[in-house]
């Protein structure tokens, strides 16, 4: 169903359109999408620029929302639990490694604060749709997925997707929305069955693998978040030239760094020796 409340308005076609806010001038709109699955409602909020300067995206922004929103003592898998998806400040920029986003909630595995990062196309696509973060609360009565296509936001039925493997789910959502470039962040059977270490995946190759964020998403009967955006990061930057130069400089540094090949060929396991030497394993 269309997700149209508060600052949203309804088009003649019946879908929800949420107004765009002006960009901040440094590649961020400051727009936050809030979704209440119990009431099947959503609205946008404009983040104060002073707050965004203190918590400029990613882990910092996710932590800010968790501190503000989460009620101590709330069970990680209850409808009142808060799930935050937050982009980094540079996510979507033409800069090496700028494709990261963070998912945060109370961890069902540890009971403590949990967060997990991932790369891939989902984060940049969320930025292109005009959002810095998504805050999800409540629990849908039946399986659903969230569709975000620029200003059009819908909560759609996912009954036919529940129990299916990620490859099938991604293909089915793209077919339903008629767009093969829709980026899908989703849970698998582990998240559906509330396995406390369940992960999230986007593009079938990038994973939020830590702290059981898949179980939190599954507890909300939220199968997936599908995003498609038409804007681009550079359009919201006051002075694009330094960003482009930063991108070139970082690309050279990353290419020449001794860890680059290990990370490219081995993924996160390429950091085992480094983390062990630092006493972080």
What are these regions (language model features)?
Residues 3-117, 121-281:
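Intrinsically disordered, low-complexity segments enriched in small residues
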């Amino acid at each position: 169903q269309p997700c149209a409340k508060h600052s949203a308005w309804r088009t003649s076609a019946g879908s929800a359109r949420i107004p765009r806010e002006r960009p901040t001038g440094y590649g961020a709109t400051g727009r936050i999408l809030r979704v209440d699955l119990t009431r099947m409602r959503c609205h946008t909020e404009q983040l104060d620029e002073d707050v965004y300067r203190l918590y400029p995206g990613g882990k910092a922004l996710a932590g800010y929302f968790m501190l503000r929103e989460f009620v101590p003592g709330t069970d990680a898998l209850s409808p009142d639990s808060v799930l935050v998806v937050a982009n980094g400040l540079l996510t979507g920029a033409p800069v090496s490694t700028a494709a990261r986003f963070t998912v945060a909630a109370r961890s069902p595995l540890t009971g403590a604060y949990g967060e997990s990062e991932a790369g891939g196309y989902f984060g940049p696509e969320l930025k292109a749709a005009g959002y810095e973060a998504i805050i999800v609360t409540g629990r849908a009565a039946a399986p659903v997925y969230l569709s975000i296509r620029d200003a059009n936001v819908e909560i759609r039925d996912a009954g036919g997707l529940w129990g299916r493997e990620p490859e099938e789910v991604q293909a089915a959502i793209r077919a339903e929305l008629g767009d093969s470039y829709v980026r899908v962040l989703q849970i698998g059977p582990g998240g559906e069955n509330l396995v406390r270490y369940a992960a999230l995946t986007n593009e079938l190759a990038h994973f939020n693998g830590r702290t059981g964020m898949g179980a939190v998403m599954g507890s909300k009967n939220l199968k997936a978040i599908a995003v498609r955006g038409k804007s681009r990061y550079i359009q919201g930057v006051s002075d694009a030239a330094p960003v482009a130069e930063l991108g070139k400089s970082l690309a050279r540094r990353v290419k020449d760094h001794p860890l680059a090949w290990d990370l490219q060929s081995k993924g996160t396991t390429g950091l085992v020796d480094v983390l062990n030497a630092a006493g972080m394993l």
